[in-house]
């Protein structure tokens, strides 16, 4: 921050949604690059893989934590991808593909997914994921 000189690294991504190989290699490059920093890291984005899959485990089993689970208070934790559809069918799994990941040195106070629809319309095909953090 300008006030106290605190430095951190914020990286954002949108991994490929069609090619599993591109997604796998993209994540590997991100993690390899991010772990080189001595400063705290915040890695955000549309990762195009679901919570619990192998890539999610790779992302969160090392130096990064999913802010949803690191948060002192989880205000909501719903679906992050809507595809502009108001209802998820019973046989469709929740589509949580957007994450805020943090390294040591980052405290997550709150986490939430903002699932409001102004005027009943989706402003995007993704809901905003918000974390209040301290570095």
Task: Provide a role label for each language-model segment.
Residues 18-22, 47, 89:
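Extracytoplasmic/periplasmic, Sec-exported soluble proteins
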Residues 1-7, 16-33:
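Soluble catalytic domains of enzymes that build or remodel membrane lipids, polysaccharides, and related
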């Amino acid at each position: 921050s300008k006030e106290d000189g605190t430095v951190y690294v914020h990286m954002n991504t949108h991994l490929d949604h069609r090619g599993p190989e591109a997604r796998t290699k993209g994540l590997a490059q991100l993690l390899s690059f991010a772990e080189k920093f001595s400063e705290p890291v915040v890695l955000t984005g549309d990762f195009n893989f679901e919570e619990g899959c192998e890539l999610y485990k790779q992302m969160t089993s090392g130096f990064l934590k999913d802010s949803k689970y690191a948060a002192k208070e989880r205000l909501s934790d719903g679906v992050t991808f809507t595809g502009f559809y108001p209802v998820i069918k019973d046989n469709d799994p929740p589509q949580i593909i957007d994450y805020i990941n943090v390294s040591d040195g980052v405290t997550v106070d709150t986490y939430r997914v903002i699932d409001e629809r102004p005027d009943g319309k989706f402003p995007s095909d993704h809901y905003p994921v918000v974390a209040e953090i301290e570095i």
